[in-house]
Amino acid sequence: MKAGEAIAVVGPSGSGKSTLMKCLGGLMKPSAGSVSLAGKNMTRLTGQELVELRQKTVSFIFQEGNLLPDLNARDNVAQPLRHQGVSSKKALALADAMLDRLGMAHRVSALPAMLSGGEQQRVAIARALITQPRLILADEPTGALDPVTSREVLALFKDLHQNDGVSFLIVTHSKEVAAFANRSLELRDGRFVAEHGEGVDVENLSQDRELIIDETGTVTLPPDLLVRLGG
C-alpha cells in the first residue's frame, strides 16, 4: 500500500476482512506470513514496540464508535494523547480543536449516550485523527449510520484523504464507500483473488475484475468465475 492511498477491501461476509484488519493493525497475530507497517515487520516486534509503532502510525475506526461510556466527547478524543504522555491541558486543547473541525464543538461535554449515531462516529473519527496517523484502518465505518450521515462521514474521509494525505484501508459492503477508494481488493476465504479500479460495484464484482497472482504463482478464482468456466 502506497502512502496517501485509499484502498477498499470488499467481498462476502466471512471471507476474512475483519480478521485481516486486525492483523494489519497489530491487534491479532497472523497464523502465517508477516505484516509490515512503515517498513517494520510487526510480527517480530515486542509488545511494547508494537504499541509504540501503532500509536505513531495507525488509528482505527469501527462500525460502532467504541467510545468510553463514562467519558464525554472531549475526554474520549483526548485519551490517545494522554496515553502518549501528552499533558492533560494540551490534550484537551487539541481535542477541542479536532472536534471543532468535525462540527462537534457544541457537543464536547456530552457523554456518548447523549449523542446520535452520527455524532458518536464523528467523535470516534476525531479520536482516530488526534494522533495524526499516517494510516486509518476502518471496518464498516458507515455500516450503522443512516444514508445522510453516511454521506457526511464519507465527505469527511474524502477531505482528509485529498487535503491531509491520510491513507485509508476500509472494509466495506457499501457501494458508496468502495467508490471513494483509489482501488479495491476482493477477498474470499482469506485470499485476495482480484483487484478492482475506481468506481467498483460491490454488488457485481465480476464486472471489472483483474485477477491476482500471489507470490507462489497461484491464481485463486472467485466462485462465480469457476461456475462460468464449468468448474
Residue ranges: model-predicted function:
Residues 111-115, 119-121:
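Conserved ABC ATPase signature
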Residues 33-41:
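Conserved ABC transporter NBD signature motif
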Residues 136-139:
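Catalytic Walker B motif of ABC-type/P-loop ATPase nucleotide-binding domains
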Residues 42-59:
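ABC ATPase NBD coupling module
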